[in-house]
C-alpha cells in the first residue's frame, strides 16, 4: 500500500533555533503541517513577503496556500491568545478557517492556570525555573492528573465544566497564599476566544492524520522549543512540561513510530538559552554580548534577553542520538561572519578532572573543552550557493558533521526565506 510519510522538524538545543523559518522553507514539499506539543510560551518568528510574524500556537505552514495545518492533541491552547494570533493573520489576508484544524483532545489553558503558574513560581523563592507565566506547566499538570479541560469540552455543557475547574484552581491558589491577581478582564477575553474557537474545524486529529497518510500524502510535524527543554531528556528541572523530542510527535499527533521518515534537527551555529538552568558554553564577556546583538537574541514572546555561548557539540551529539536525527539544519551562520576566532565545545571536564565526550545527568559544574577555528570574516548573507562559502566556513561545517556523524543539509545565512542554502 502506498502510504504517505511523516517527517519531523525539531530543535536540538534550548529552543529558539529558528524552526519557524525552516518550516516555511520546507512546507512546499508537504501536504499537511502539524504542531505536536507546547503552547503559546514558544514563538516561531518568520519573515514572509517583507513582514515579520510571530506564531505561538498556529503551525508555520499557514503561509503556504492550499496546505492543511493541524494543531495536535499534544498542544495546550489558550483561546484568547489563539484568537489574537489568528485574527492578526486574517487581517494580513491569510485564510485560516478552511485550512486550520484543531484536535478535540488538545487541552485548554485557563485564566486560572496563568495565576497558578505565577503563584507556584513565587512560592519557589530562589529555586525558580524561569517560567514564561503562560500557564503551560499547570495545564499539563491537570492533563496528567486527568482533571483538565479539552477543546472538545466546549461543545457540550461547557460553562459548568469551566466553573468547576476554576473553583478547584482558586482553592489551590489560596493555599499558596497568592492574592495579587484579578482575572475579570482576562476571563472575558478568554470566553470570547472560546466562541471564536467554535468557528474552526475541531477534529479527531489522529484519525485525520492517518487518513492523510493512507491517501499517500506527506506530513511535516513541527515541534516547539528544543530537545534540551524536554521534560524527560532535558536539563531538568529547567525544562518545559512536554516531550519536545521526536517521540513526542507520535504521542502528540497519534501516529505510529513506523510512520516516521526523516528527522530534521535544527541547530544554531552557536548556542542560546532563555531563563535559568545549566549552560556549559555560556559566554559572559563581550563575545557573548556581540553574538546577542548580531543575532538579535531576545525572546519572540517574552522579549527576554537570551544567554549566548559557543556551539556545544557534546550536547548536540546527545540530541542527535535521542531524536534519531537524519539531517542537520544549521541556522544563523551569518551571525559569526565577523569573528576572528570561533570555538566549539568538543568535551566536558568534570569536577574530578576527568574529560568526557558524553552528555551526562548532571552538567551544572562541567568545564567546556574547546576546539578553535579560524573565522571566515566574510559577509555570506548574499550568497546563493555553497560553492561561494569561504574555506574556513567549509572547514567548520565539515568538523561539525564529522563530530555529530550527521550531514548538514540546509544552512541559513540570514532571516529571509531566500537566505537559505540547500546543499547538494
Task: Describe the function of each predicted region.
Residues 1-424:
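Non-transmembrane, aqueous-exposed alpha-helical and coiled segments at domain scale
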